Amino acid sequence: MTKLSKRQQQILEFIKQEVKTKGYPPSVREIGEAVGLASSSTVHGHLARLESKGYIRRDPTKPRAIEILDSDLTKEREKEEVISVPMIGKVTAGQPITAVENIEDYFPLPKRLAAGEKQLFMLEVMGDSMIEAGILDGDYVIVRQQSSANNGDIVVAMTEENEATVKRFFKEKDHIRLQPENVHLEPIIVRDCTILGKVIGVYRLIN
């Protein structure tokens, strides 16, 4: 491959680092901020030269579609370990959350994002009751299976009406308050509930 200028090397290393740590490439603006270039056209020019020299491949129809043509990085990403996290389609009272009949699919979650947890499941969020916690309608919450919770934890709970809900948990004097993170909604007050797990992460597709 053709030798790179110092600036091109900086840009390439930044892209590699972002892909390695986040799993996707940076935007043109992020590249410019990282290497001290205020002009997006200048960044585009460097990216074009990196592409012509065989270091990257770009898709002009997509803003972040930068592929690193680097065998070492490719091999490292290919060998990255993943765990198969069950994606729960429904929650049935009296059954384990990961009962076979509840599982719709499996999601390949990189181990480095699982934070050492093994007993995980994912559940699609429906509605806007947790928007102020950054959990939106259509998101998938990543949940660690556990049967207890501390006040303030965001949990998946089964209510007395056998409905699963994602709310913030508070055990109070003679009841449990399942608090939405939406100022327009009222809390759910129950005498008891079953904790299915604690939310530890969120997965979202960006359209």
UniProtKB/Swiss-Prot annotation:
The record marks 93-94 as: Cleavage. It is an enzyme of class 3 (hydrolase). Keywords: Autocatalytic cleavage, DNA damage, DNA repair, DNA replication, DNA-binding, Hydrolase, Repressor, SOS response, Transcription, Transcription regulation. It catalyses: Hydrolysis of Ala-|-Gly bond in repressor LexA. Pfam families: LexA_DNA_bind, Peptidase_S24. Its EC number is 3.4.21.88. Residues 28-48 bind DNA. One of its GO terms (molecular function) is DNA binding. Represses a number of genes involved in the response to DNA damage (SOS response), including recA and lexA. In the presence of single-stranded DNA, RecA interacts with LexA causing an autocatalytic cleavage which disrupts the DNA-binding part of LexA, leading to derepression of the SOS regulon and eventually DNA repair. Homodimer. This is LexA repressor. The gene is lexA.
